[in-house]
Amino acid sequence: MNIHEYQAKRLLHEYGAPIANGVAVYSIEQAEKWAKKLPGPLYVVKSQIHAGGRGKGKFKELDLDSKGGVRLAKSVEEVVANVKEMLGKTLVTKQTGPEGKQVNRLYIEDGADIERELYLSLLVDRAVGRVAFVVSMEGGMDIETVAEETPEKILTLPVDPVQGVTSADCKRLCDALELHDNARKDGEKLFPILYKAFCEKDMSLLEINPLIVMKDGHLRVLDAKISFDNNALFRHPDILELRDLSEEDPKEIEASKHDLAYVALEGTIGCMVNGAGLAMATMDIIKLYGAEPANFLDVGGGASKEKVTAAFKIITADPNVKGILVNIFGGIMRCDVIAEGVVAAVREVGLKVPLVVRLEGTNIEQGKAIISDSGLNVISASDLDDAAQKIIAAVRGA
């Protein structure tokens, strides 16, 4: 689960991280009221959407030469003018796709006298099985680009889960970021704070880009992105309250109601599979034969007929889907249950695109018989390779 920048900053501030004074607003009237209460004279007006690249993004409704989704203002009047131009508009960034995201809230905060911009994040380093700091002097940039072009400029520092962030860890991080005097003292306080927040709140990513050194020599969190482990949210009702459903894909929201692992993608082949590994293999072979999957969907090992029906409805609700591939290896999951769910869903929502079904394992013969006796226009496949080729051929021939 993701949260907005202002929510992330508020959470980090509760742990003691240094942030600017700021307020989230939902209307022009609120913007004027609260901007007057900020010290000024420099303000920053930030679009709040779950996507990066906001500063370089463009609003669909405005001219191409208009400013992006993060703007500076030198007076309350300029703040209000920018809010009028940004609120309710559709912001397109490199992460939103061409459809963009509507800006329903803005964050207004004090400007900062920036001396240097740094990059800092915490994530789970699966190679060593530990939470790790990732830091770089190249703040404000796309860290993926830095990693690809100049990987030597990045330090990855795994943290011992027993000892936590040690003084030696702080020294390495401060040295890597070339922090001195007040900034170094701030860093020695900040790094353990961030690690504590990451672990206590079950985060999967905490990214500060940039972390700035101000001209007075102190550190400040200028931008923050936090993602949480969905499987741990039951422990954090306070975090669940921060969820903004308007920022999430409606299909993914519906899938979560049925305990389905679903991720929307940008392809045209809808996939329904049991097991994450088999689901990824299914997507891989679709790409191998020159097409793109429209989703990742794992119905799990013990799905019911109702769950399978719900999964099928979610796939068919995607207008980009031009064909559907059902790939089931029945171990705990029985092929006849899958077949019953598919048949029930097709009869309820109709079948407007080609459907290929590959079944293998427990009760395979019963499953095939259910589909065969249904009278539906379903293409059977003998194995995964055959299934992938058949669905792609059917879509291209449609």
From Swiss-Prot:
ATP binds at residues 46, 53-55, 109, 112, 117. Pfam families: ATP-grasp_2 (PF08442), Ligase_CoA (PF00549). Mg(2+) binds at residues 209, 223. Keywords: ATP-binding, Ligase, Magnesium, Metal-binding, Nucleotide-binding, Tricarboxylic acid cycle. Binds 1 Mg(2+) ion per subunit. GO terms for molecular function: ATP binding; magnesium ion binding; succinate-CoA ligase (ADP-forming) activity; succinate-CoA ligase (GDP-forming) activity. Pathway: Carbohydrate metabolism; tricarboxylic acid cycle; succinate from succinyl-CoA (ligase route): step 1/1. Its EC number is 6.2.1.5. Heterotetramer of two alpha and two beta subunits. This is Succinate--CoA ligase [ADP-forming] subunit beta.
